[in-house]
């Protein structure tokens, strides 16, 4: 799908390139189906960006020390996106998903839930530990560590989402 997206962008006149996880520089440990990112070598991504190209990266995968392809497990694509944002010193990482943001409860299961405009990293980690599946713990922990705000947005509906950050204004 990364190659198809890059091809579609190129057809629209937007210079794009696609990279697998290992081409993008994701290095992981050896836990094949739930690997952790140990290093992100951003030279290739940076080189493409310097050439004014849109870089479409396959999330969820990397390469271990034995040059074996690994997968990051549940939420691996979100974690990959946050890792790239942190490595490139971005202020914010947008995560597009099937919901319009973070809610007080799962709107598919509970009536009268409220979408949150903002939430702290710690509050999001608490929700995730209680079963919220909007963002997984690894991506939120990484965003908190590198102070990269997360913006949860809907892939289906262009409405404001939820910003996950260090401090929320009262």
Q: What does each model-identified segment do?
A:
Residues 18, 124, 150-152, 164:
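Generic structural hydrophobic/aromatic packing signal, biased to beta-strands
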Residues 1-140:
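Nucleotide/pyrophosphate-binding catalytic subdomain
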Residues 132-138, 142-160:
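Conserved glycine-bearing catalytic or ligand-binding loops at nucleotide- and phosphate-handling centers
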Residues 1, 6-7, 153-156, 170:
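Proteins with a high burden of low-complexity, intrinsically disordered sequence enriched in S/T/G/P/A and R
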Residues 28-29, 161-163:
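Short, solvent-exposed polar/charged micro-motifs at secondary-structure junctions
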Residues 60-61, 99, 154-156, 168:
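A broadly conserved detector of short glycine/acidic/proline-rich loop/turn motifs that flank catalytic sites
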Residues 163-170:
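A conserved regulatory-domain signal marking ACT and ACT-like small-molecule sensing domains
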């Amino acid at each position: 799908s990364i190659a198809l997206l890059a091809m579609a962008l190129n057809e629209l006149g937007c210079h794009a390139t696609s990279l697998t996880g290992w081409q993008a520089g994701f290095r992981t440990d050896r836990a094949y189906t739930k690997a952790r990112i140990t290093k992100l070598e951003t030279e290739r991504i940076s080189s493409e960006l310097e050439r004014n190209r849109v870089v479409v990266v396959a999330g969820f995968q990397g390469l271990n020390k034995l040059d074996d392809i690994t997968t990051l497990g549940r939420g691996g694509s979100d974690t990959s996106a946050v890792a790239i944002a942190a490595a490139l010193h971005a202020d914010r990482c947008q995560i597009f998903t099937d919901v319009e943001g973070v809610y007080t409860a799962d709107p598919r299961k509970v009536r009268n839930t409220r979408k949150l405009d903002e939430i702290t990293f710690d509050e999001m980690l608490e929700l995730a530990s209680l079963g919220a599946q909007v963002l997984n713990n690894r991506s939120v922990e990484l965003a908190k560590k590198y102070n990269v705000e997360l913006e949860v947005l809907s892939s289906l509906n262009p409405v404001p989402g939820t910003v996950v950050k260090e401090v929320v204004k009262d």
